[in-house]
Amino acid sequence: SPFILKFNDAQKDLIEPALAGTKNVLSSVNATTSVKRVVLTSSVAAICGDTIECANTPNGKFDEHNWNTTSSAIHQPYYYSKTLAERAAWKITEDQDRWTLVVINPALVIGPTLSGKSTSATHDILRQLGDGKMKAGAPPFEFGVVDVRDVADAHIRAAYIKRAVGRHLIFNEVQSLLGLANLLKEKYGTAYPLPSKELPKWLLWLVGPIVDKTFSRKMISLNMGQKWVGDNSKSIEKLGINYSSLKASAEDMFQQMIDQGEFHKK
């Protein structure tokens, strides 16, 4: 599924590709009798749509039992696309009994890429931290974070561990944009224009949609300044994942972007 923040048509750019990709692959699986297990890359986006929902969960934290029921084609459309795609996968799975489905639901994925420069939303976030766009302050936004190499490890384990079943929320730590910036400052100091404070929510609500169309007032109200809490115990107990250091993950990604000339010292 495309992971992009800037798009022209949510239905055509996000939702249709996510659904078509899932259905096409699983159609091929149904036609290939040797396949016994499918590992699907879904997302935390299929578990929760807005951070504020965390307070309404039974245990006060997101886990594999939760489904995103609040996103739509006009509110958090990327989250909506991932939810529709995973639900479609489970429906196709239920209609047959030859192969099993195991789902990986990663939170925000960071770490170095294999392909060099990237246009993914994750890279946009790190890029804006390092190129000065957030110098005046970072939005007060919390999220789960995981190293891309841990996500790869989770897929391999999900494929070969027999007891693996169902969904798996994959993240190491909960962090904020300012928290990521502070981790990077431990190595890079003030060499790059990393933010040193958070912007007030009221200011983002007032001017955010004017400055950046990806920030709707509804999105700001339901996510900024809210606590994100998740439960990753299933991934540790059932898949045996030993999560990497978030600090090392952020540094590896940031350094790769520096080496590629994506931003420069002040």
Where are these regions (language model features)?
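Glycine/proline-rich active-site loop of Rossmann-fold NAD(P)-dependent oxidoreductases
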Residues: D95-W99, G111-I125, A158-H168
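Active-site "gating" loop of Rossmann-like NAD(P)-dependent oxidoreductase/epimerase domains
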Residues: S43-I74, L114, D131
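Conserved C-terminal active-site "lid" loop/helix of NAD(P)H-dependent oxidoreductases
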Residues: G208-G240
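Glycine-rich Rossmann NAD(P)(H)-binding loop
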Residues: G111, A138-F141, H168-Q175, E237-L239
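Active-site Tyr-X1-5-Lys
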Residues: A31, T70-V102
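Mid/C-terminal beta-alpha module of Rossmann-like enzyme folds, strongest
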Residues: A154-R217, L246-K266
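A conserved pocket-lining segment of Rossmann-fold NAD(P)-dependent short-chain dehydrogenase/reductase
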Residues: F7, N68-I74, S115-G116, A121-V146, ...
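NAD(P)H-binding glycine-rich loop region in Rossmannoid oxidoreductase-like domains
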Residues: S1-A20
